[in-house]
A protein has these predicted regions:
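ABC-type ATPase nucleotide-binding domains, specifically the catalytic core motifs of the NBD
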Residues: 12, 68, 93-112, 120-122, ...
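The feature captures the beta-strand-to-loop junction immediately N-terminal to the Walker
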Residues: 33-35
Length: 239
C-alpha cells in the first residue's frame, strides 16, 4: 500500500503542498483531480523521488520511500509515467523501452518483458525500429507506459496520460489502464479529463491549493455538485 502522510513540498519560498495525506491500496485505482497549479504533479514527483519533501512521509508496502533516490524507488516497484511522455526522440521504440529495464532483475528478464509490452501494445511491435520522435501522440503515450512497465512496477504513477490526445486515442489508453488494473497493478492517476478519471477510479481525492479538500468513490464524486461545477463544465452543471 502507498501511504502519504502530512507531506509538505515547495519550490524555494513557494509552498506547493500543505500536509497532504492519502492512500492507495493494493490493486486499487485512485485518481487525483484538481485545478491547474493545485500541486498534483508535484505530489507525483515527490512520491517518485524527483522532489525532496520538506516534511512528512511517503511509505510503500510499509517501508519509507522519503529520501530514497528515484532509481531505488523504481527498484522497489513504483514507476512514474511523466506528463509530456519524456521520450528520447532520436532513439528507437525498442531503445526507449530498454531504458526502462535498468534494474538488475529487469535486465535479467528484459526479453520476456519486451515480449509482454509488445503483446499489450502491438503497435509498438510494428514500430520497433522507428524513432520515437516520429510516432503519433497516442503511440508516444503507449511507449511511455511501456517503458515504465519494463521495470515491473506494482504501482504506476500516471501524470496526465490523456493530455493532447484525440478522444478515440484516450479511450484506447484508458482501456489499457483498465487492463493493467485487472492484472493487479495499482494505479495513482493525475488526469485533466475528470470524467474519464472518475469513471476509471475506485476512489479519488480532490486537491486544491496544495491541500486535500475531498475524498470519495469515483462514481459518487461524479455526481457531486462541487465537482461537477468546478471540473465538468457548464453542461454538467445544467444536467
Amino acid at each position: 500500500m502507498l501511504e502519504v502522510e502530512r507531506l509538505e513540498v515547495g519550490y524555494g519560498a513557494l509552498a506547493a503542498l500543505h500536509g497532504v495525506s492519502l492512500t492507495v491500496r493494493p490493486g486499487e485505482t485512485v485518481a487525483l483531480v484538481g485545478p491547474n497549479g493545485a500541486g498534483k504533479s508535484t505530489l507525483l514527483k515527490a512520491i517518485a523521488g524527483l522532489l525532496a519533501p520538506r516534511a512528512g512521509l511517503v511509505r510503500w508496502e510499509g517501508t519509507p520511500l522519503t529520501g530514497e533516490p528515484a532509481h531505488r524507488i523504481v527498484e522497489r516497484g513504483v514507476a512514474l509515467v511523466p506528463e509530456g511522455r519524456r521520450l528520447f526522440a532520436r532513439m528507437t521504440v525498442r531503445e526507449n523501452l530498454e531504458l526502462g529495464a535498468f534494474t538488475r532483475r529487469a535486465q535479467a528478464e528484459k526479453e520476456g518483458r519486451l515480449a509482454r509490452i509488445y503483446e499489450i501494445f502491438p503497435r509498438l511491435r510494428e514500430r520497433d525500429r522507428q524513432l520515437s520522435g516520429s510516432l503519433s501522440g497516442g503511440e508516444q503515450q503507449m511507449l511511455a507506459l511501456g517503458r515504465a512497465l519494463m521495470g515491473g512496477p506494482r504501482l504506476l504513477l500516471l501524470d496526465e496520460p490523456s493530455l493532447g490526445l484525440a478522444p478515440r486515442v484516450v479511450e484506447t489508453i484508458f482501456g489499457i489502464l483498465r487492463q493493467l488494473h485487472g492484472e493487479g497493478i495499482s494505479l495513482f492517476l493525475v488526469e485533466q479529463n475528470v470524467q474519464a478519471a472518475l469513471t476509471l477510479a475506485q476512489r479519488a481525492y480532490l486537491l486544491e491549493g496544495g491541500r486535500v479538500v475531498g475524498e470519495g468513490e469515483g462514481r459518487i464524486l461524479l455526481q457531486d455538485e462541487h465537482v461537477r461545477a468546478a471540473y465538468l463544465g457548464p453542461l454538467a452543471r445544467r444536467g
